[in-house]
A protein has these predicted regions:
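A short coil-to-beta-strand element that immediately follows conserved catalytic motifs
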Residues: 93-104
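Catalytic core of non-heme Fe(II) oxygenases with the double-stranded beta-helix
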Residues: 105-148
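Alpha-helix initiation and capping sites
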Residues: 70, 74, 78, 98-100, ...
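Residues at beta-strand starts and edge strands
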Residues: 11-13, 100-102, 123-125
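Non-heme Fe(II)/2-oxoglutarate
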Residues: 1-94, 114, 140
């Protein structure tokens, strides 16, 4: 994929870019995620009967757990808004768009587990942001064809 340009995967627009860690509190956010992870490394079995190990540290399950600290993402939405606006402008330069974005998930995986393919229902599009990614340890996001 070509960074900062519209690319097409299965006929659907995709956009890859880098977010400068100096523009948001990357280390603080990552530290909060890692502290929660250390308290409970694999408490969510993401898929029931799966050939793959799917034990992950998954944000939506954190909300009701008093032991885990709420992660403060306040520095990210403004940066996401810039990226989303740029993406939409590249799709249709003549149009003015308004959008809202919500951080609905944070997943921490460090122990040879995977998040299985899934669909984000109710979303016009999704954004994946890797705060920390080691090519030797992690599998990248894989896009499956929506046609089969």
């Amino acid at each position: 994929m070509i960074p900062n340009e519209i690319n097409y995967i299965y006929g659907l627009p995709a956009y890859i870019t880098k977010l400068d860690p100096k523009l948001y509190e990357k280390n603080k956010i990552l530290s909060q995620i890692e502290k929660n992870y250390k308290l409970s490394k694999a408490r969510n079995k993401w898929a029931g009967d799966s050939f793959f190990k799917t034990e992950v540290h998954y944000l939506p399950e954190d909300k009701k757990n008093p032991k885990l600290k709420k992660i403060n993402y306040y520095s990210l939405p403004q940066q996401y808004e810039k990226i989303i606006t740029n993406f939409l402008h590249k799709l249709a330069p003549q149009k003015n768009f308004t959008s809202t974005n919500v951080i609905v998930n944070c997943t921490c995986i460090r122990h040879n587990s995977v998040m299985l393919p899934h669909i984000h229902t109710g979303c016009t599009f999704s954004l994946v942001h890797y705060l920390s990614f080691d090519k030797k340890q992690h599998l990248p996001t894989i896009f499956k064809s929506p046609y089969y």
